[in-house]
Amino acid sequence: KDKKLLILSNGTVVLDQDKFNTLLKLDVVKFSLDSAISKTFYRIDRALKNINLEKMIEKMAEFKTQFKGDLVMEILVVKDLNDNEEEFIALNQALAKIAPLRVDLSTIDRPPAYAVKKISEERLLELSKLITSTPVLLPKRHYEGEKLNFNEEELLKMLHLRSQSEIDIENKLDKTSQLLLDKLIKE
């Protein structure tokens, strides 16, 4: 069993006991939770109007207690919707209950379905500091300084924590690490 099975879900699947039980069999589960405040949650995730947010958070926490794999949370930050201190204090409290391995925090980076705007990387970093209950991973699109030189173990750990785009690999890793990664992929 050298490959891991991952699913990305909006999190509502925990409300269905059959789906809840099925997810327990996976290696990595990634739930999105863009707000822990009902009014904002329904504005961002418009299709989920009939979902009880508090119950969903409780079921995510219950899922974590039974899950043997890695539970990761994903938060998409949208300008003027969930990009404020109140939102992140509420998210931090919800994340403390859920207790995931980590949180992947990002903003809009593709053309959105609705008229929404991204926030700056600087603001994303500021908001990430309000999440103290679990480790936070931030995407970094613009790299400065020296490129990283990773050995095989470090490369595998990095990829285990977060998949990397080709752009990320080109910008983050030195040539030696890129060649080693190519070799690992071919094996």
Residue ranges and their predicted role:
Residues 43-50, 117-118:
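Short glycine-enriched, charge-decorated loop/helix-capping segments at active-site entrances
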Residues 47-64:
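Glycine-rich S-adenosyl-L-methionine
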Residues 36-40, 70-72:
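Short, basic/glycine-rich phosphate-binding loops at helix/coil junctions
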Residues 60-84, 105-113, 144-145:
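Conserved strand-turn element in the central/C-terminal portion of the radical SAM core barrel
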Residues 21-25, 64-67, 96-99:
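Short, conserved loop/helix-junction motifs that constitute active-site signature segments
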Residues 4-6, 28-30, 70-74, 102, ...:
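Structural preference for beta-strand elements that scaffold enzyme active sites
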Residues 86-187:
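Auxiliary Fe-S-binding modules of radical SAM enzymes
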Residues 1-28, 33-37, 51, 55, ...:
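Canonical radical SAM enzyme core domain
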